[in-house]
Amino acid sequence: ILANVLNGISYASILFLIASGLSLVFGVMGILNLAHGALYMAGAFIGLTAAGYWGNFLMGVVVAVISLGVIGLVLDRLFLSRLYKQFNEQALLTLGLVYICANVVMWIWGPWSRIGKSPAILTDSVTIGDFNFSVYRFAIIAIGLVIFGGLWWLQDKTKIGARIRAGMDNKEMTTGLGVNYGMISTAIFILGAIMGGLAGFLGAPIIG
């Protein structure tokens, strides 16, 4: 039972990274981003390619984060920032982006799935009772907890978080008080894209 619980928590940590990025974008910007799963996929392939090229897992993380940040910036500035509260247009655009991203990934990396390798320092297992549990899965759980704490601190304990909450309640009034909510929204979309891509790369050794 303990093995199933720990495995479930490690999977839940990956799902948390995906879902938190999606909910941030929808909650703060009101953007229904159906392409969030495509960002997850892009982060996985970009990170795996970088990690394989440099032979370093950390480089995969860095490249995936930077790449998804740039992709998020481009998507927000060129498309999504113009579609505030236009839910039908958002759905059509982001659904189209899913197909575009899927075809670009297939064109570059082919139709075959890939399994990521965990970093050498985290390849060992810990014996718990009668079973061995991967150190990498423990690391994923820890990363999920750290990000959860970081998001809570950002939202509830900082001035930026207060502005985010105010904008979620009333964007027009917040903007009227002199808050550059457009910049905050762009930063949130970039953060959401990064979290989706990071989940893809970190989850590759577990999910594939």
Identify the meaning behind each predicted range.
Residues 23-26, 51, 75-76, 80, ...:
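Membrane-water interface at transmembrane helix exits
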Residues 132-208:
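Helix-loop-helix "hairpin" substructures at the membrane interface of multi-pass membrane proteins
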